[in-house]
Swiss-Prot record:
<feature type="binding site" description="distal binding residue">
    <location>
        <position position="63"/>
    </location>
    <ligand>
        <name>heme b</name>
    </ligand>
</feature>
<dbReference type="GO" id="GO:0005344">
    <property type="term" value="F:oxygen carrier activity"/>
</dbReference>
<dbReference type="GO" id="GO:0042744">
    <property type="term" value="P:hydrogen peroxide catabolic process"/>
</dbReference>
<dbReference type="GO" id="GO:0020037">
    <property type="term" value="F:heme binding"/>
</dbReference>
<feature type="binding site" description="proximal binding residue">
    <location>
        <position position="92"/>
    </location>
    <ligand>
        <name>heme b</name>
    </ligand>
</feature>
<protein>
    <recommendedName>
        <fullName>Hemoglobin cathodic subunit beta</fullName>
    </recommendedName>
</protein>
<dbReference type="GO" id="GO:0031838">
    <property type="term" value="C:haptoglobin-hemoglobin complex"/>
</dbReference>
<dbReference type="InterPro" id="IPR012292">
    <property type="entry name" value="Globin/Proto"/>
</dbReference>
<dbReference type="GO" id="GO:0004601">
    <property type="term" value="F:peroxidase activity"/>
</dbReference>
<dbReference type="GO" id="GO:0005833">
    <property type="term" value="C:hemoglobin complex"/>
</dbReference>
<dbReference type="InterPro" id="IPR002337">
    <property type="entry name" value="Hemoglobin_b"/>
</dbReference>
<keyword id="KW-0479">Metal-binding</keyword>
<dbReference type="Pfam" id="PF00042">
    <property type="entry name" value="Globin"/>
</dbReference>
<comment type="function">
    <text>Involved in oxygen transport from the gills to the various peripheral tissues.</text>
</comment>
<dbReference type="GO" id="GO:0043177">
    <property type="term" value="F:organic acid binding"/>
</dbReference>
<dbReference type="InterPro" id="IPR050056">
    <property type="entry name" value="Hemoglobin_oxygen_transport"/>
</dbReference>
<dbReference type="GO" id="GO:0031720">
    <property type="term" value="F:haptoglobin binding"/>
</dbReference>
Amino acid sequence: VQWSSSERSTISTLWGKINVAEIGPQALARVLIVYPWTQRYFGKFGDLSSVAAIVGNANGAKHGRTVLQALGQAVNNMDNIKGTYAKLSQKHSEELNVDPDNFRLLGDCLTVVLATKFGAEFPPEVQAVWQKFVAVVVSALSRQYF
């Protein structure tokens, strides 16, 4: 993937505005609520029986932060995203048996959370670059499956 200097700047600037502790839990909670079948991967989290339970779930919030921190690795390694996520892709494929489409669902939910949070600071041209970035990350995480 080729990144223009403008795209790199857009991703870097947006990432600099993201509060991992806030956005990560919101994005993961949204996945679990909007796509309830994804809850099957998180049995150890405890109660995920309602929206309130999901939003208030400390284990879910912690994992949401972990996921978003991992996304920061891609921001810092835009020239080698596939290499950055090789082991994580293998873990999700071979150990956790996660359906790789769930990475796309998470990316979509993260985009919704960012659009909600940043409003006018997340115009279509920023979203376009962000979507490209997320697509590359999803591809890298799905790599081990094929």
